[in-house]
Structure formats: C-alpha cells, structure tokens
Amino acid sequence: MPTINQLIRIGRKSKKEKSNSPALKSCPQKRGVCTRVYTTTPKKPNSALRKVARVRLTNGIEVSSYIPGVGHNLQEHSVVLIRGGRVKDLPGVRYHIVRGTLDSVGVKDRKQARSKYGAKRPK
C-alpha cells in the first residue's frame, strides 16, 4: 500500500489491456497464405469435424483460423483474408477467414445471413 506522498510523486500505473487477436497488430483484417487446410474435432461436449486452415500472414506470423460456412474451396497456397474472432470449442483458433474475398469463395445457396458468408443475392 503506497503512502499519499508516493502516489503524488509517482502515481498509479494503468493496466495494459491484452488483445484477443494479437497477430492482427491492431488491424481490422490481414491477408495471408494457407500453409495447411485440415479438419479438427472440438472440445468435450461437442462432436464434429471443424474446418481449419493454418495461415501465414503478411507480417510473418502463422495462425490457425476457422473456415465458416458449408463447404469451401481452400487449399494450400490459397490467399485469404483473416479477421479476429475465436471459435469457442476449438482451442487455439482465434481467427476467422472472411468468405467471398480473395481466393475464398462465398457459401453456395445461402439465403439468410448472406453478408457473413460472402453470398450474392439470389435472383
């Protein structure tokens, strides 16, 4: 516990807020190249095969990122755009791939929540 004098001399240090997506380096999105595309199983109460890609970003950092939506066209050397946002049941996956940009194609036959999956408006 500091004395009043110590507080007047030095003051209190403010706590630094920790980022949930440090690899983005405070950018909204980052471009990267897929180094590996694979499926993983989620944590305990859930069961599925979640689609994940390992991506090397333009700043040299390599991260795991989730591929949302039904079906995808990504493979090794695909150029993708990445945004923050973790997947709760996949440990270590803190980023999402943005569908419908660069090499990532939007979800086919998507009627609702189209903007989240890069789907065009159906005719």
UniProtKB/Swiss-Prot annotation:
With S4 and S5 plays an important role in translational accuracy. Interacts with and stabilizes bases of the 16S rRNA that are involved in tRNA selection in the A site and with the mRNA backbone. Located at the interface of the 30S and 50S subunits, it traverses the body of the 30S subunit contacting proteins on the other side and probably holding the rRNA structure together. The combined cluster of proteins S8, S12 and S17 appears to hold together the shoulder and platform of the 30S subunit. Keywords: Methylation, Ribonucleoprotein, Ribosomal protein, RNA-binding, rRNA-binding, tRNA-binding. Part of the 30S ribosomal subunit. Contacts proteins S8 and S17. May interact with IF1 in the 30S initiation complex. GO terms for molecular function: rRNA binding; structural constituent of ribosome; tRNA binding. The keyword Transcription regulation does not apply. Pfam families: Ribosom_S12_S23. This is Small ribosomal subunit protein uS12. It comes from the Bacteria. InterPro entries: NA-bd_OB-fold (IPR012340), Ribosomal_uS12 (IPR006032), Ribosomal_uS12_bac (IPR005679). The modification 3-methylthioaspartic acid is found at residue 89. One of its GO terms (biological process) is translation. GO terms for cellular component: small ribosomal subunit.
